[in-house]
From Swiss-Prot:
Gene3D superfamilies assigned to the protein according to its UniProt record, in alphabetical order: Nucleic acid-binding proteins
Molecular function as annotated in GO: rRNA binding; structural constituent of ribosome
Protein's UniProt keywords contain Plastid: yes
Function summary: With S4 and S5 plays an important role in translational accuracy. Located at the interface of the 30S and 50S subunits.
Superkingdom, taxonomy of origin: Eukaryota
Subunit structure: Part of the 30S ribosomal subunit.
Xref: InterPro entries: NA-bd_OB-fold, Ribosomal_uS12, Ribosomal_uS12_bac
Homology family: Belongs to the universal ribosomal protein uS12 family.
UniProt-annotated location(s): Plastid, Chloroplast
Gene Ontology annotations for the cellular component aspect, listed alphabetically: chloroplast; small ribosomal subunit
Family matches, as Pfam families: Ribosom_S12_S23 (PF00164)
Gene Ontology biological-process annotations: translation
Protein name, entry field: Small ribosomal subunit protein uS12cz/uS12cy
Length: 124
């Protein structure tokens, strides 16, 4: 326990909270290039083949990003836009690829929740 004199000389430093999306460097989104596109298995009790991509960002980081939606056209060297947002059952996946921008096409035949998958409003 420090004395009052020690606290006057050297004030306590506030604890800084670590950023959950450090690779974005404070930006809402970042552009990146896919280095590898593959599937991984989720944690127990879930079972699936989740589509993810290893992305090299313009900030210099290489991250693992989730590819949301059914079906995708991404491959190595595809240019994608990445946002923050973890996938609860995939350890280490803290980013998501934004569909409908750059090389990531929108999800086909999507009727509800379209904005999250880059789908335009259907014509009547």
């Amino acid at each position: 326990m420090p004395t009052v004199k020690q606290l006057i000389r050297n004030a306590r430093q506030p604890i800084r909270n670590a950023r959950k999306t450090a690779a974005l460097k404070g930006c809402p989104q970042r552009r990146g290039t896919c280095a590898r596109v593959y599937t991984i298995n989720p944690k127990k009790p879930n079972s699936a083949l989740r589509k993810v991509a290893r992305v090299r960002l313009t900030s210099g980081f290489e991250i693992t990003a989730y590819i949301p939606g059914i079906g995708h056209n991404l491959q190595e060297h595809s240019v994608v836009l990445v946002r923050g947002g973890r996938v609860k059952d995939l350890p280490g996946v803290r980013y998501r690829i934004i569909r409908g921008t750059l090389d990531a096409v929108a999800v086909k035949n999507r009727q509800q929740g379209r904005s999250k998958y880059g789908v335009k409003k259907p014509k009547k």
